[in-house]
Amino acid sequence: MRVSEDTSTKEVFERVAADFLQLYKRCVLAQTREVRSSDRERCEELVRRNALARELCKLHQTLCFVYENDALYGIVLDALDLEGIYGRVEEGPGADDYQDRLVQELLRYFKDEFFTWCDKPLCARCGTAKKQAAVGHGKPTVEEARYRCTVVELFRCEDCGDVARFPRYNDPLKLLETRTGRCGEWCNLFMLILRSFGIEARYTWNREDHVWCEVYSNALKRWVHVDSCEKSFDEPHIYSVNWNKAMSYVIAFSNRSVKDVSRRYIVRNRLPRDQIDEDDLQFLTKYLTKLLRLQLPDEERYLLHCRDELEAIDLLGSKTAPMEIPPAAGAAGRQSGSADWKRQRGEDGR
């Protein structure tokens, strides 16, 4: 009789849990199926009066869509050593999960073999960058502007007097050709490479002038920090701890979401978050995320919402949990860039 009662109680709990889950799912889908006019008006008003809101909306309009172009993926893959990449993924050490190993190999290949860092461009006459001195900025040519270049850095060689141009291209396909740049160019092209491999990725923007990527690890069931400049995988602490970088806002952008992930990265040296009301920032990121998901099937929209909830719990823990720093990642200061450049940016670990 006791066994029967226990079984009956278990069945009741299971039915109640299933009913509750279905009710929760219906509520989630109802809330994410359409945009209320009041929310649209609130967003428009927020953008009118707040500079950071305007900047985030502008980033959303670009970063959430520029990497979602199937026509580019074949061009990208044709430019890479796929045989070598896949061979090392199959044979080499790394994470247990295949996709995580692939991301780690792409980080290695991109930094060690494919892309180069540019503090200063080479002098065309002398063939070296040692005597290049920054002399300001110029306007992009018509050809440079075709590739979303809005700024051209100018350098004069102190030996021969020649002036070199360093166009800051924002078109990732152009970067596939030039294969050089600083953190903006590195992140831009690496993001396109990740998407070309079908890897779910986010472009992660820091208000204090750094950018990197995140990938969703199906094995770890969470978003993982990825920085191609540093060849860094799942080391979100490196900016606050290793670089000693002061930061305020970190926002991640993808074709499916806009998310404030500051808690994941800012564990020390927190700058004041006084550029926007926290409630307004939370509203804005959720509103932009809702816009990105409106046309998705119900099941996908619900799955993404559940992932959001799990990430929110993870981020809440990131603020208070002690930061564990792997010994291999303990080097002080940023690895990419010249010593002077890193010191000027406050990223040298001092």
UniProtKB/Swiss-Prot annotation:
Belongs to the transglutaminase-like superfamily. PNGase family. Its EC number is 3.5.1.52. SMART domains: TGc. One of its GO terms (cellular component) is nucleus. One of its GO terms (biological process) is protein quality control for misfolded or incompletely synthesized proteins. The gene is PNG1. Residues 340-350 have a biased composition (Basic and acidic residues). It is found in: Cytoplasm. The keyword Kinase does not apply. Residues 324-350 are annotated as: Disordered. Its cofactor is Zn(2+). The active site is at 183 (nucleophile), 210, 227. InterPro entries: Papain-like_cys_pep_sf, PNGase, Transglutaminase-like. It catalyses: Hydrolysis of an N(4)-(acetyl-beta-D-glucosaminyl)asparagine residue in which the glucosamine residue may be further glycosylated, to yield a (substituted) N-acetyl-beta-D-glucosaminylamine and a peptide containing an aspartate residue. PANTHER family: PEPTIDE N-GLYCANASE PNGASE -RELATED, PEPTIDE-N(4)-(N-ACETYL-BETA-GLUCOSAMINYL)ASPARAGINE AMIDASE. Binds 1 zinc ion per subunit. Keywords: Cytoplasm, Hydrolase, Metal-binding, Zinc. Zn(2+) binds at residues 123, 126, 157, 160. Substrate binds at residue 230. Specifically deglycosylates the denatured form of N-linked glycoproteins in the cytoplasm and assists their proteasome-mediated degradation. Cleaves the beta-aspartyl-glucosamine (GlcNAc) of the glycan and the amide side chain of Asn, converting Asn to Asp. Prefers proteins containing high-mannose over those bearing complex type oligosaccharides. Can recognize misfolded proteins in the endoplasmic reticulum that are exported to the cytosol to be destroyed and deglycosylate them, while it has no activity toward native proteins. This is Peptide-N(4)-(N-acetyl-beta-glucosaminyl)asparagine amidase. It holds the Pfam family Transglut_core. Gene3D superfamilies: 2.20.25.10, 3.10.620.30. It comes from the Eukaryota. One of its GO terms (molecular function) is metal ion binding.
